């Protein structure tokens, strides 16, 4: 540095002068030779008190310089005075007492806190008074708002009663709030928005709970208060309530008042009110006014609902031209949805494909599908409604609708309309025209071809033309392999041919394509039932019952399967569910009676058989059981009415009239029994049983006709015997050929010998009454002699007071018949 000179030596100011000069106190090389320093290191002599135990804080107030610090001088080992000490009793300046940011608290070991956060929040300037009126008003207002919110939440959750209670509570507290606010502040400070929300919520909850009078009163309070702005709109709500009450004139009045108070800038709200007015006009039958309302809506803001209602109104007045124009307006309503091509990937870009897959079934796409389905439903319904009336014939009307649809954005609906045209032909029982219409689709695209072939297959199936049905079912399946209806029809044709296993496979495939195809599920249950796979059949019908909870057919099938599985208790339980759905089904009631009868519960069986008889008094099996029940319970006179009805239903069956006569005889009305037997003999002169009873009654009563009837009886029995011999000989000679000629009395009484009593012969006749193979038989009918044997035992013989001796029955067989009585 001595050889480098950046400025002339003659310069008076040397920039580097004194650079090499330094205080000898900083010379660390001489510390080893410094006696004072070494002594201070080895001992505590001259050591300064520790002041770095904690970081000093700047948040403590600055100490006063005078008379507060230490008065002694602290000297370092080098003899240099310590910073901040007072030397020789001379007071130093105040700014030199301590370093900036430090305080006396540092000497006590406090933490460094320059922002003063350890002291906490600043104390309030004034203590909070919770009992002040303003604070009470604020708390009460907060509580009212909470109650209104809770009321709305309860309403959205479906708890209407709780919502109304919360709304009432909010109304009560709001009135208290208004009174307190009036006492504390001026009336201008009242919270009108809170009052409006409380009253409006209360009226809404009243309306939701169908308390319409209270709701109207609350709305009136709001509407009449001029301080509420836009309260006139609530007249729409009042009109809705009057509409629910069917007070249509007042509803229209309030709708129009609301329409007058709503400015024209609120176009959407005005359109909705006009739509309500149009619907109210329809309900009152004022179709012309309704047409005007809907036409105005269609000119301002066309919509599907307004267009459909316009068509209905025009149809009601029968105006063909207006119906056509309204249909065209409905077709022209814009759907405002994206085309299906948007959801088809134009390239192999994975990012684009992923995006399309994400939006293919999102909420917007679902909404578009629903809107399109609703539009198609409205158009199809309107076309089916007006097609038969807009032209001279429904076929011409359908053709006009099809042409209009083809020229619109709903081109695919034209084929559906054609199929509906075929169905209309079917309703008119014009089978050939329906078939011709459906055959037109054989050259169309696969979807339409499959639908048409499915209908044709079903039509031929109903006509029992199973070959044609199978052919068109194959065509439908080939056109659309995933058409569950086509597969079901194919299964039906196979089922009709008796191939149940193959039919089950078609039904299974239909269910794989559409698990909600109830027809296939029902048919597969029937198929399993035919195959005697009852567990699988029951499983199918139980699945179907989960889908169709109130289907009588499904309930009946489940009950029948349990009956086949010999579980009568379960069968009874399901039949009880069935009659809860169709309480007037006589077959279900009679089946319940049969099951209870098989279980031995006669009283329950009688109850359900009697209910079945009330709903269908022409069921012979039920009549037969009821008659046998009354005979079994020894009320023969009550059984008469049932057997008389049976004789009216089957007048050629002699057994019912014999039962009536037998009931008269057992009830002690012998004269009526005699008259009945005579009437039976007049209608059926060759009936042996009737003649036997006539002989018996005439003998008991002592009438002179006994010989006449006895002679006829002998002749009939002899003829019957000769006929049987002739039949037997003919059978022996011809190898068992049977004769077709039979007596009207039947062969059941001819097997008795002459020694048998008349009661035994009658018992044998009556045992056939409740046949053993009938579905509605009484469980004990095989042992009950319903007409011929008295359940209490043989009748007591009448006293023999007649002068004439009784003729023994066995004498009939001992007498010889003349040649004139023998058959030719």
Swiss-Prot record:
Tissue: Testis.
Role, per record: Positively regulates primary cilium biogenesis. Also involved in autophagy since it is required for trafficking of ATG16L and the expansion of the autophagic compartment.
Top-rank lineage group of the source organism: Eukaryota
Entries under InterPro entries matching the protein: TPR-like_helical_dom_sf (IPR011990), TPR_rpt (IPR019734)
Protein name: Intraflagellar transport protein 88 homolog
Disruption outcome: Cilia absent or reduced, virtually no cilia of the normal 5 uM mean length. Conditional knockdown in preadipocytes results in loss of cilia. Mutant mice show a significant reduction of gonadal white adipose tissue and total fat mass associated with reduced serum LEP levels.
UniProt TPR repeat ranges: 196-229, 232-265, 271-304, 415-448, 450-483, 484-517, 518-551, 552-585, 586-619, 620-653, 654-687
One record GO biological process: kidney development
Subcellular location: Cytoplasm, Cytoskeleton, Microtubule organizing center, Centrosome, Centriole; Cytoplasm, Cytoskeleton, Cilium basal body; Cell projection, Cilium; Cytoplasm, Cytoskeleton, Microtubule organizing center, Centrosome
One Pfam family it belongs to: TPR_8
Record note on quaternary structure: Component of the IFT complex B, at least composed of IFT20, IFT22, IFT25, IFT27, IFT46, IFT52, TRAF3IP1/IFT54, IFT57, IFT74, IFT80, IFT81, and IFT88. Interacts with IFT20, IFT22, IFT25, IFT27, IFT52, TRAF3IP1, IFT74, IFT80 and IFT81. Interacts with IFT172. Interacts with IFT57. Interacts with IFT46. Interacts with IFT70B. Interacts with C2CD3. Interacts with ENTR1 (via N-terminus). Interacts with LRRC56. Interacts with DZIP1. Interacts with CCDC38. Interacts with CCDC146. Interacts with CFAP53.
Region feature (Disordered): 1-27, 111-134, 721-824
Associated pathology: Defects in Ift88 are the cause of recessive bilateral polycystic kidney disease (PKD) with collecting duct and tubule ectasia, and a liver lesion involving biliary dysplasia and/or portal fibrosis.
One GO CC annotation: ciliary base
Compositionally biased residues, Basic and acidic residues: 721-731, 797-808
Molecular function as annotated in GO: kinesin binding
Keywords: Cell projection, Cilium, Cilium biogenesis/degradation, Cytoplasm, Cytoskeleton, Flagellum, Repeat, TPR repeat
Compositionally biased tracts (Acidic residues): 809-824
Signal peptide stretch: none
């Amino acid at each position: 540095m001595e050889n480098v000179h950046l400025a002339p030596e003659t310069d008076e100011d040397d920039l580097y002068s004194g650079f090499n000069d330094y205080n000898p106190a900083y010379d660390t090389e001489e510390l080893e030779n410094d006696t004072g320093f070494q002594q201070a290191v080895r001992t505590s002599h001259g050591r300064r008190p520790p002041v770095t135990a904690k970081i000093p804080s700047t948040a403590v107030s600055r100490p006063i310089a005078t008379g507060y610090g230490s008065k002694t001088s602290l000297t370092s080992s080098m003899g240099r005075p310590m910073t901040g000490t007072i030397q020789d009793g001379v007071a130093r300046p105040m700014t030199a007492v301590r370093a900036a940011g430090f305080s006396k608290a540092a000497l006590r070991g406090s933490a460094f806190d320059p922002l003063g956060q350890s002291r906490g929040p600043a104390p309030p300037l004034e203590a909070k008074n919770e009992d002040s009126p303003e604070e009470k008003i604020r708390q009460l207002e907060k509580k009212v708002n909470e109650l209104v919110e809770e009321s709305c939440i309860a309403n959205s959750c479906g708890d209407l009663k709780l919502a109304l209670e919360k709304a009432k509570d909010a109304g009560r507290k709001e009135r208290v709030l208004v009174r307190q606010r009036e006492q504390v502040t001026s009336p201008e400070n009242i919270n009108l928005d809170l009052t409006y929300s409380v009253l409006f919520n209360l009226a809404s909850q009243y309306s939701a709970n169908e308390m319409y009078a209270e709701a109207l009163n609350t709305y009136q309070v709001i509407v009449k208060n001029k301080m509420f702005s836009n309260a006139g709109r609530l007249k729409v709500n009042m009109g809705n309530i009057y509409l629910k009450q069917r007070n249509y004139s007042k509803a229209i009045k309030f709708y129009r008042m609301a329409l007058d108070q709503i400015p024209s800038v609120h176009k959407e709200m005005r359109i909705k009110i006009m739509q309500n007015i149009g619907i109210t006009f329809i309900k009152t039958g004022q179709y012309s006014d309704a047409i005007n309302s809907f036409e105005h809506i269609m000119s301002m803001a066309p919509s599907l609902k307004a267009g459909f209602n316009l068509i209905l109104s025009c149809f009601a007045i029968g105006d063909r031209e207006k119906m056509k124009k309204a249909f065209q307006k409905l077709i022209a309503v814009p759907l405002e949805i994206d085309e299906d091509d948007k959801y088809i990937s134009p390239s192999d870009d994975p990012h684009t494909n992923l995006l399309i897959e994400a939006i293919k079934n999102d909420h917007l796409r679902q909404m578009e599908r629903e809107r399109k389905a609703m539009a198609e439903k409205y158009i199809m319904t309107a076309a089916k409604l007006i097609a038969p009336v807009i032209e001279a014939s429904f076929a011409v009307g359908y053709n006009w609708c099809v042409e209009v649809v083809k020229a619109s954005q709903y081109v695919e609906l034209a084929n559906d309309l054609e199929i509906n045209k075929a169905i209309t032909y079917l309703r008119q029982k014009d089978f050939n025209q329906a078939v011709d219409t459906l055959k037109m689709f054989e050259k169309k695209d696969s979807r339409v071809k499959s639908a048409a072939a499915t209908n044709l297959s079903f039509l031929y199936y109903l006509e029992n033309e199973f070959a044609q049905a199978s052919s068109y079912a194959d065509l439908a399946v080939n056109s659309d392999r995933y058409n569950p209806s086509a597969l079901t029809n194919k299964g039906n044709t196979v089922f009709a041919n008796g191939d149940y296993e193959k039919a089950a496979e078609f039904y299974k495939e239909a269910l794989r394509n559409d698990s909600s195809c109830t027809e296939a599920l029902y048919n597969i249950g029937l198929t399993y039932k035919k195959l005697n796979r009852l567990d699988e059949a029951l499983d199918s019908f139980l699945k179907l019952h989960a889908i169709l909870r109130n289907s009588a057919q499904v309930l009946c099938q489940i009950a029948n399967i349990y009956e086949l599985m010999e579980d009568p208790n379960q069968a009874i339980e399901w039949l009880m569910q069935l009659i809860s759905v169709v309480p007037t089904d006589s077959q279900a009631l009679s089946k319940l009676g049969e099951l209870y009868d098989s279980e031995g519960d006669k009283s329950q069986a009688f109850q359900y058989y009697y209910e079945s008889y009330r709903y269908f008094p022409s069921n012979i099996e039920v009549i037969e059981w009821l008659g046998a029940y009354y005979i079994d319970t020894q009320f023969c006179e009550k059984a008469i009415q049932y057997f008389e009805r049976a004789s009216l239903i089957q007048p050629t069956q002699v057994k019912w009239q014999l039962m009536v006569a037998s009931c008269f005889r057992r009830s002690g009305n012998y004269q009526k029994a005699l008259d009945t037997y005579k009437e039976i003999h007049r209608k059926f002169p060759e009936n042996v049983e009737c003649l036997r009873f006539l002989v018996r009654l005439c003998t008991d009563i002592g009438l002179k006709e006994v010989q006449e009837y006895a002679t006829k009886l002998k002749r009939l029995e002899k003829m019957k015997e000769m006929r049987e011999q002739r039949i037997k000989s003919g059978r022996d000679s011809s190898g068992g050929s049977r004769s077709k000629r039979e007596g009207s009395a039947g062969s059941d009484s001819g097997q008795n010998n002459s020694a048998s009593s008349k009661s035994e012969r009658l018992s044998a006749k009556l045992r056939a009454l409740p046949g053993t193979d009938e579905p509605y038989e009484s469980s004990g009918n095989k042992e009950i002699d319903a007409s011929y044997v008295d359940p209490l035992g043989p009748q007591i013989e009448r006293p023999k007071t007649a002068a004439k001796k009784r003729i023994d029955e066995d004498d009939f067989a001992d007498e010889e018949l003349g040649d004139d009585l023998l058959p030719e």
